[in-house]
Amino acid sequence: TTELLPVGTEAPDFQITNDKTGEKIFRLSDWKTKTDADGKVVPGVWTVLDFWASWCPDCRKDMPKVKEISKKYLTKIQLVGISFDTDKEKMNKYLSSNHYDQWMQYCEGKKWKETQISKDYHISWIPTSYLIDPEGKVYFSTVKAEEMMQKLDSLNNLGKLTAFIEMPHYPGGKAVLMKQLSVNTKFPKLCQKYKAAAKVKVEFIVEKDGNVSDVGIQSYQVLDNPNGKDFNKLSGAEQTQVRSQIRTLFEQEGIRVVNTLGKWIPGKIRGEATRVHYTVPIVFRLY
């Protein structure tokens, strides 16, 4: 790592934009310590930059640890993947199929050595990761995700990593949320008839004003397959059709019940209300 940017170097700035709209999604320099219009100091945020590519075997080997970093320090650091993939579609497919799409990605769509960011950050090997401090300077660099985790753990133990994200929460807390879900959820009759059970993860956005939008299904897990005399009488094709109907009904009910919850207390980033992605698990089981 001797060729990498030295500790204390101002981290070269870069920006992630929406490919379709050109809208800014992220700019590194926006996350430095700053003073707002009222003269109040807004603390900066620690940022991990992970340089990688989906075609790189060592990068793929390190990805589970990068995901662990993302999960463990979700509210305390920004994690940005910087990919040297030339095919963004392939990159996105790799990320989504392996559930590595929970953090931001920067990709110029050019060959590694032709990218500006590889020159700015002196990247001669991947994977490589940098830790940028709240003042926007290089604090640490490594070619091993495990070492980055150890550095973050050390900083966290010293109390230097503090939450900059406040997650949305339901008025009255989790117990009230669970009660609302339990009271308002209706068990579909077809699912009851065939004694089916499932766990549905419903995802949605809690908007800045606390309203819920973009409600959809993140995952569906069968807990009990349909069974009983009525189900066993069906042909193979009919059983397949029933399973599909059961899934549709459970998913529709999950979406419906989340839409009945009303307003949430919105999440905040650095003290300002913001849109936050959220998931709620709903278990459908009668017995």
Language-model region placement:
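N-terminal targeting signals for export/organelle localization
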Residues: 1-13, 17
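Short, small/polar residue-rich loop motifs at catalytic or cofactor-binding pockets
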Residues: 10, 45, 124-126, 195-200
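Short pre-active-site segment immediately N-terminal to redox-active cysteine/selenocysteine motifs
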Residues: 44-47, 51-55, 125
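Conserved segment of the thioredoxin-like fold in thiol-based oxidoreductases
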Residues: 69-113, 119-126
